[in-house]
């Protein structure tokens, strides 16, 4: 009811909501149509910041809600949120690769092997500095160069940590869109970019992959890594991949 009342009154505005752990979880779940059964899956640290972007329809049932950031606590002087008491299991550090020239040019890369540009290497070095004091037991990366380079830069501060490359983490195959910018795609495939933005689950790019196909191959790799980490009693695992697979 809160979102239904508030959203129509504040179109194109930034709303600050300060509440409690349970209330924040409920608001996040309601905005993203997540069952209340998953409330304990959501962590809310003291003075954390969450950023939700609403599409602006004013109707929660029709909203496309983007979770821009979640449980941010870096402003509190902590690298990562504290684990809950009696936590058992694995912590995954999920990182997207640094910038490439094609990112900067808004070209669809897919599985074309583009290296990091100067800014991408600088971004990776900042991530490396941020995670320098965080204990990492094992690292996994997409086998594409931009992800591997990012991982190797991060691991410069973690000597002895093993790195495993995995094709399952490669970016979604953009098919005939690969190498093209948005203007070229719109010219060659009119209306398809808008469909991709609004209902990506219903669109398969020509000669590319569907989101369902990416989901299936990525989940299989995640499950394999989780099972291996549990069997080897690992605590923290780094994964560096792509916007689509992450």
Which role fits each region the language model picked out?
Residues 112-125:
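Short catalytic helix/loop segments, enriched in acidic residues and glycine
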């Amino acid at each position: 009811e809160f979102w239904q009342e508030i959203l129509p009154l504040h179109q194109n505005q930034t709303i600050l909501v300060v509440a409690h752990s349970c209330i924040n979880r409920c608001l996040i779940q309601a905005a993203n149509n997540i069952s209340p059964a998953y409330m304990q899956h959501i962590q809310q640290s003291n003075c954390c910041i969450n950023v939700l972007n609403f599409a602006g329809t004013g109707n929660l049932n029709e909203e496309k809600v983007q979770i821009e950031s979640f449980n941010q606590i870096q402003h509190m002087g902590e690298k990562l949120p504290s684990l809950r008491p009696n936590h058992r299991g694995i912590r995954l550090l999920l990182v997207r690769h640094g910038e490439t020239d094609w990112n900067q040019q808004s070209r669809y890369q897919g599985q074309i092997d583009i290296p990091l540009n100067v800014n991408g290497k600088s971004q990776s070095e900042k991530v490396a500095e941020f995670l320098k004091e965080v204990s990492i037991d094992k690292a996994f990366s997409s086998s594409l160069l931009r992800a591997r380079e990012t991982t190797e830069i991060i691991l410069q501060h973690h000597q002895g940590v093993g790195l495993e490359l995995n094709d399952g983490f490669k970016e979604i195959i953009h098919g005939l869109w690969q190498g093209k910018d948005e203007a070229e795609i719109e010219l060659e495939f009119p209306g398809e970019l808008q469909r991709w933005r609004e209902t990506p689950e219903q669109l398969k790019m020509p000669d590319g992959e569907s989101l369902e196909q990416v989901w299936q191959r990525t989940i299989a790799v995640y499950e394999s890594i989780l099972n291996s980490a549990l069997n080897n009693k690992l605590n923290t695992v780094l994964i560096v991949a792509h916007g689509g697979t992450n």
